Amino acid sequence: MSQPLLSVNGLMMRFGGLLAVNNVNLELYPQEIVSLIGPNGAGKTTVFNCLTGFYKPTGGTILLRDQHLEGLPGQQIARMGVVRTFQHVRLFREMTVIENLLVAQHQQLKTGLFSGLLKTPSFRRAQSEALDRAATWLERIGLLEHANRQASNLAYGDQRRLEIARCMVTQPEILMLDEPAAGLNPKETKELDELIAELRNHHNTTILLIEHDMKLVMGISDRIYVVNQGTPLANGTPEQIRNNPDVIRAYLGEA
């Protein structure tokens, strides 16, 4: 197997006397779909927050290839190609659909203040590329006809897809999805399943997924990590996890 794209070793996160994440280890290899699951309150989102710079871990290492991420600000981690969605949709609600995708690309535009003020050819070219990229992703998720609609007026499922597209216009290596199927109906969940598979298969994106929809998780994941009360419980293929007695007990509330 190739070198891990992301390696997490001994991750710890303490809030006062509460140990929210306790010695979590995980690896992501290029173009994998890996899920992080566990009962409510298991520490999954806290792990995401550590990986993406929202929290500074109390201990452990996070390596993107050979670059340490622990303690870096979220914006810098995003520029390095690690982006995320959230449990609750976080769009610029007063902006239009396409403006949300253009704003997301602002940090990727390799033009300085001088170029922007003078509208130099390089600035105009970068702006045109950003607009083309935004339109391409809106077409892919079926929202191109709503490009000029205010984001807050979209249906909930459309807002979820827009949030993923907002990540993808930045051309990330790793996309972390925090409960993307929450609140979706069965048809929307199936479309999400297909979209995640396409991101991996056709856009070379590595996916780390937190999700409570076990049908989605078991159907799409290459590997699964399980945490309970902040502590690693198991990891393996979907079949191995499905038949793991410790995992079964945790989900039945016996662990």
Swiss-Prot record:
State the protein's purpose: Component of the leucine-specific transport system.
Alphabetized Pfam families for the sequence: ABC_tran, BCA_ABC_TP_C
Output the Gene Ontology terms for molecular function.
ATP binding; ATP hydrolysis activity; branched-chain amino acid transmembrane transporter activity; L-isoleucine transmembrane transporter activity; L-leucine transmembrane transporter activity; L-phenylalanine transmembrane transporter activity; L-valine transmembrane transporter activity
Recorded superkingdom: Bacteria
> By its UniProt entry, which PROSITE patterns does this protein fall under?
ABC_TRANSPORTER_1 (PS00211), ABC_TRANSPORTER_2 (PS50893)
Q: Which Gene3D superfamilies match?
A: P-loop containing nucleotide triphosphate hydrolases
Q: What is this protein called?
A: High-affinity branched-chain amino acid transport ATP-binding protein LivG
Query: Might you name a Gene Ontology BP term for this protein?
Result: branched-chain amino acid transport
List keywords of the entry alphabetically: Amino-acid transport, ATP-binding, Nucleotide-binding, Transport
